[in-house]
Amino acid sequence: VSAMCLEALRSFGKIAVEAVAGHSLGEYTALYAAGSLSFRDAVKLVNLRGKFMQNAVPLGEGTMAAILGLDRNIVNDICIKASSKGTVEAANINSPGQIVISGKVAGVAEASGLCKEAGAKRVIELQVSAPFHSSLMKPAADSLAEELNKITIKDASIPVVSNVTADYVTSAGTIKELLIRQMTSPVLWEDSIMKMSNDGFDTFIEVGPGKVLTGLIKKINPKLKIYNVADAATLGDFLGSWHPGQPAEAAR
């Protein structure tokens, strides 16, 4: 869906996209936008990736929780302490004060309790089928690596900001390596947006259903201009306010 929204946007020929980024699964759309993955390969990889993650940990053994209102260093320290009960790690650094943890049910439960004691505003257990972006996804990462060897990954035509490093990447070889590492690494979304903001990017377009990333970006830097293109109505709104040739960063 995100790729189709992107193509609808491109068909008007008004946008000079200078970099792209995607959150977790959305990184595949970003790589498609940058010409690194074909649409066919991106869809294939996304489908296989989901299956590999489901098979990595038996259903019911892993979970995730959102921690609101605590500094990331505190959350990381708590995860280390709670890991005595079971694997638990930071999985998504989404925005200031919004961190998702992932791991074994007992480890996440222990960390959630400690986060509440440390003053977290809210701790929300997420309804997920697996502990994504944790070391428990190593079997899934290994399976994905095998599939990546079967497809063609091209150098990106524009910089892609990696979830793993929060830095620009264009090399096909590095992109492949980072897609594998992404399975077991935290999504550094806050760091990615700050990197681009510090480098002068001031306009972002969220492409695809929903406004989750728009909300996160506003929390990271309220001064940034953010647009959302999710359907015909929002596409029309965007085209009515956009200035041709204006540089942008596409997020999904």
Mark where each language-model region is.
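Alpha/beta catalytic cores of group-transfer enzymes, especially the acyltransferase/condensing modules
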Residues: 33-186
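FabD-like malonyl-/acyl-CoA
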Residues: 1-75, 126, 203-233
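Alpha-helical and His/Cys-centered functional microenvironments
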Residues: 27, 137, 250
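Acyltransferase/transacylase module recognition
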Residues: 1-17, 149-252
